Each structure stands twice: as structure tokens, then as C-alpha cells.
Amino acid sequence: PELTTLKKNNEYFISGKLNNKSIKLDKNEIKNIVKEELLGLDIQKIIFSSQNNFSFKVDKNLKFKDFKLLIDIELDNLIFTNSFNLKNIFPKIKKKIIFNKQKIKLKYEEENLSITGKGEVFLQNKIDKIKYEIIKRKNEFQLNTTLNISQNPFELYLLTYQKNKNSVLELNLKVKQVDKNELIFNEISLKEKKNMILVKI
């Protein structure tokens, strides 16, 4: 670990670096570190390694401010509870969603959280590939994601659309969360072989 402290006027500027090798946390350990409301997820288990850069200021009254955090994460395994009703588009969706072999960049600054990443995901019975960007500003949550579905089903009843069993479907979603259990899909695009569908809501 590295730690640097600079004094300017009546404030201390503190910055540091910290590398973590393979950390495993269960649900209770995670709750002791990060508020569930901040993450917006009910995480059951996580295994990861990370490179962390952080900085913050401390005033003469020992009040912390301007906290910034940059993390590069190698996520081996993440399991969280599926709290969203997505069975109408992912017919075989699981009660627990699993992320494996993810490369993630996380940035936290002034109550704003952004996460970008890519890797494997078990939404249904087989592995799919996923890329994503998550933005959380106070009570607002946005998700932009690309999901490549190969051996899993996908359906859109509204358009009477069903994925071909032997083809690869590229699904792009722009989603906003309005409360803990409700998602609004702003844009959905599908690409399967020569078929393309774009839906803006």
C-alpha cells in the first residue's frame, strides 16, 4: 500500500493506492462495507482482486470531503438475487444471477457511481457474454448493456419475436430504474443474423 498526505491551508489532502489479491466476501461481510442502497443489488457472494486508487480531504474539524475512488477489478464470481421481473423476455431466468470472469472499472465521486465492465453471465441456463455501463447518481440508476445470447431463449411478446435456437442474438438495452423493483426500458435493439429491431420507448 502507498499513502501520501499533503497539507494546504487548514486542510489535509490524502491519497493512496492499495492492491488486493483474491478477496471472498459473503452477504453479511458486504453489508458491513457498503450500503445495499448504494449498490442497488442484494449480493450473496463475491470473489475478486483489485487495484485501488483513492483520495479525500480532511479539514481542521476532522470532517471528510471530496472522496474519490478508482478501482480496476478482476471479478472471478458475483452472485446476487434477481429482484426484477424479466421472465417475459428471458423465459429461463434464474432466481440468482451469476457474473464470472469480469473485467470492471469502478469510479465513485461525490455520491456518483459509474461502473463499466465485460465478461460472462448466467442469467438463464447457459453462459452468455455481457458488456455494460452502470451509472448511479443519488436516486437515479441507468444501465446501458450489450448481451450476446447464444444458447439461451429470448422472447418479445409485444412484437411476437422469438430468438432462433441455433443463432446468436445481440441485445442492446438502455434501462432506467425508477424504484427498487421497477425498470423502465428506454431503448431496446436486437440483431440476429440479418434481422434487426429497434424499439424506443
Regions found by a protein language model. Give the residues of each.
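Membrane-proximal interfacial segments on either side of biological membranes
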Residues: P1-I201
